[in-house]
Amino acid sequence: QTMINRILIRIKVLQIVYSYYQNGNGDLKVAENELLFSLQKSYDLYYYFLLLIIEVTNLQRRILDTRKCKYMPTDEELNPNTRFVDNRFVAQLAENDTLKKYVDEQGLSWSNDEEFVKNVLDTILSSEIYAEYLKNEEDSYETDREFWRQIFEKVICGNEMIEEYRSEERRVG
């Protein structure tokens, strides 16, 4: 399976140990089960985010296709910039057998959260990182991967909308 960051594991262990001593619960097996559950939720979150990349890209692809088919589309709608939807990093993720298997086995999906996926897409499309990505002369796998790294670092991580969604759903993390 995917390697979870050592710092995250240490934090989870310390949280469980703290809880173990605070509650006065002498059952070490309960603490171990809590740790394993917490780590599993971290894995789920990791895979949810990978799946989110694919879902956001697929949504944009559907939007571009719909615009092409409308009555009297503009030249830009007929010939849109497809760099975002042709991102090689996303294509690699979408074909990753480990990701597909995990998503299928765990039943992970964004299908019930299309409005959230649309909001994430809108946030990305309105970001300076996206504008720079489209203008970048260099077109390579590395620039595609770097785009998504920056999006996660500067747009998704710490985004109030995403944090609110996670706290409301309590499905992951």
Where are the regions a protein language model picked out?
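Conserved small/polar residues in nucleotide/adenosyl-binding loops
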Residues: 170-172
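N-terminal, charged low-complexity regulatory/assembly segments
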Residues: 3-162
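Short, flexible active-site loops
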Residues: 166-168
